[in-house]
Amino acid sequence: MVGLADPVIWHDVECGAYEADLPLWRELAAGADGPVLEIGCGTGRVALDLAGRGFDVAALDSDAALIAALAERGADLPLRAGVADARSFRLERRFALVIAPMQVVQLMGGAGGRASMLACVRDHLAPAGVFAAALADPFDGVPAEDAGPPLPDVREQDGWVFSSTPVAVRSVDGGTAIDRLRQAVSPDGQLDESMTSISLDALDAETLEGEGPAAGLRALPRRQVPATGDYVGSTIVLLEAA
């Protein structure tokens, strides 16, 4: 079905409503003396927010459909979007700030992928530029015996209702898998559903900070994004170009 197959819709459903980290990204962008690059930008939750406030933003994602949606949404903003892998991108400019929100650095496929990503980031940082990366542990939060059923992420669009509900969080080799039930209800009431999983590398702040020097990056004091009723909190690791 169209709804179940559209990555733009599901990215908007599962990521678009999160706002707890936006004040921190705005603060970091305001303190940066130059343009901002977001890697793993998706449909532009953060990039559009920053560009809408006048920041010069470039945004990359490996999914062409997500980038096409972002380019359309940001057509009138100081925003450039492109398709690229975070582990191998090459741009003709440098940035005062590079950001990786929502656990993007935990999608690199382990230490080797992170090393490639960090090298790319360092190559694109201006002198004294900063890389800011969000980390989270899906097992953090309320003890299982105290937790109620998770609420679905829901979005209505063109008469359709889309919902995505986390149904399991599993330990897997090298990380954590999050299973979600995706449901799409058409305007005439037809229900279609499918399962999807995303795997996050096990990664803590100390490990990422320890990997920085090999890429020419040194750790700055961390920042925190508090948990909300619907989302776990995150640690923002800051690495400065050495």
Protein language model features and the residues they cover:
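Conserved class I S-adenosyl-L-methionine
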Residues: 1-42
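Class I SAM-dependent methyltransferase SAM/SAH-binding core
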Residues: 44, 48-88
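A short acidic, Gly/Pro-enriched loop at the edge of an enzyme's catalytic core
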Residues: 87-97
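A short SAM/SAH-binding and catalytic strip from SAM-dependent methyltransferases
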Residues: 96-112
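A short glycine-rich, Lys/Arg-flanked "PGG" loop and its adjoining helix->strand segment in the class I
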Residues: 115-127
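SAM-dependent methyltransferase
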Residues: 132-206
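C-terminal lobe and adjacent flexible extensions of AdoMet/dcAdoMet transferase-like proteins
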Residues: 199-242
